[in-house]
């Protein structure tokens, strides 16, 4: 198997589309889609995805190195694994997305958008993941780690978002995120159209979206900054014990509200460079628009993903409260 990332960026296929290694079989399922199944019995089916936003290159490079080490025998595969490079079309152009945000297209969201390379890709990703989980052992627990980097700086540099779900959250997933030295966990309060909501809702996978620092071009990442999460995902796929957490106790937040842009004249009381987890206190105005201002009712809230430039009707930010 040739270089997974290089093939994807070049839009090429490997010389052979399937093969066997010392302890696993593999299949190239299409552009940026690689399935690996251990010869031995397994009890987990794991999706590792990156590049759903094409310019978030560090996680893409982490998955590429992990793949290389699996094929070189430096890392032993103990789970059934699907590696996903989400948006090759945008990756080649160094853009977050070209037409529309792929991470708002899942759970059938692509059906409400014009047909583009990216909407077609979202459909392919849904179908590929569905087949992967359906063809995995019925006894295998299902996991999905979707790796991202953020557009803006963050007062809590690394964090994970759990999709809203009615079934209980998986303790092993949470333990792995704590071991990865993440700074915070954020629990969504409503259904969404993200990749992880799709896998959680439809396949009861233990799913999380990981935000791991700043987006930089290929080759400019200091991957040593991602050593903790890299170690954890390698331990997950090889079923090794998780490392000990080296940071203070992880902070936990709940989404309490979404800031929806209802009018063209929409302003947020944050600078353009304001980091994620910026705070507001009771009585302060977070956003103004003719249809009504957003005034803080709680003692303190934190703002995540503020973006006043979204289209009307879309979310311009998340309002969080901290769970003590």
Curated annotation (Swiss-Prot):
Binding positions (Zn(2+)): 53, 56, 148
Bound cofactor: record note: Binds 1 zinc ion per subunit.
GO biological process, one term: arginine catabolic process to glutamate
GO molecular function, one term: succinylglutamate desuccinylase activity
InterPro entries noted in UniProt: AspA/AstE_fam, AstE_AspA_cat, Aste_AspA_hybrid_dom, SuccinylGlu_desuccinylase
Top-level taxon in the UniProt lineage: Bacteria
Gene3D superfamilies per record: Zn peptidases (3.40.630.10)
Pathway note: Amino-acid degradation; L-arginine degradation via AST pathway; L-glutamate and succinate from L-arginine: step 5/5
Ranges that cross the membrane: none
Catalysed reaction equations from the record: N-succinyl-L-glutamate + H2O = L-glutamate + succinate
Cofactor: Zn(2+)
Entry annotation: catalytic residues: 211
Keywords: Arginine metabolism, Hydrolase, Metal-binding, Zinc
Record-listed E.C. numbers: 3.5.1.96
A Pfam family hit: AstE_AspA_cat
Described function: Transforms N(2)-succinylglutamate into succinate and glutamate.
Family in the record: Belongs to the AspA/AstE family. Succinylglutamate desuccinylase subfamily.
PANTHER family listed in its UniProt record: ASPARTOACYLASE, SUCCINYLGLUTAMATE DESUCCINYLASE
Family annotation (NCBIfam families): arg_catab_astE (TIGR03242), PRK05324.1 (NF003706)
Protein name, per record: Succinylglutamate desuccinylase
Gene name tied to this protein: astE
């Amino acid at each position: 198997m040739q270089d997974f990332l290089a093939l994807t960026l070049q839009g090429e296929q490997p010389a052979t589309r399937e093969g066997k290694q010392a302890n696993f079989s593999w299949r190239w399922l299409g552009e940026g889609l690689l399935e690996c199944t251990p010869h031995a019995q397994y009890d987990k089916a794991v999706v590792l995805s990156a590049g759903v936003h094409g310019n978030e290159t560090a996680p893409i490079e982490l998955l590429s190195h992990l793949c290389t080490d699996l094929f070189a025998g430096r890392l032993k595969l103990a789970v059934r694994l699907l590696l996903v490079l989400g948006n090759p079309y945008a990756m080649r152009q160094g853009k977050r997305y070209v037409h529309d945000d792929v991470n708002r297209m899942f759970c059938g969201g692509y059906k409400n958008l014009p047909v583009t390379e990216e909407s077609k890709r979202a459909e392919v990703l849904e179908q590929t993941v569905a087949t992967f989980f359906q063809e995995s052992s019925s006894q295998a627990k299902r996991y999905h780690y979707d790796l991202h980097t953020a557009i803006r700086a963050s007062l809590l540099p690394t964090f994970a978002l759990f999709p809203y779900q009615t079934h209980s959250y998986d303790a092993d997933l949470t333990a792995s995120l704590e071991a990865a030295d993440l700074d915070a966990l954020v629990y969504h309060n409503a259904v969404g159209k993200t990749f992880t909501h799709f896998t959680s809702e439809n396949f009861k996978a233990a799913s999380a979206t990981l935000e791991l620092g700043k987006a930089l071009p290929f080759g400019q990442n200091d991957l040593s900054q991602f050593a903790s999460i890299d170690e954890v995902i390698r331990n997950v796929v090889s079923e090794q014990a998780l490392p000990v957490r080296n940071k203070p106790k992880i902070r936990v937040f709940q989404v309490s509200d979404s800031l929806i842009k209802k009018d063209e004249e929409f302003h947020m009381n944050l600078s353009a460079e304001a980091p994620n987890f910026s705070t507001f206190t009771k009585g302060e105005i977070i956003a103004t628009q003719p249809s009504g201002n957003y005034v803080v009712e709680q003692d303190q809230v934190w703002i995540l993903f503020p973006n006043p430039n979204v289209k009307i009707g879309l979310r311009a930010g998340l309002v969080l409260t901290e769970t003590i």
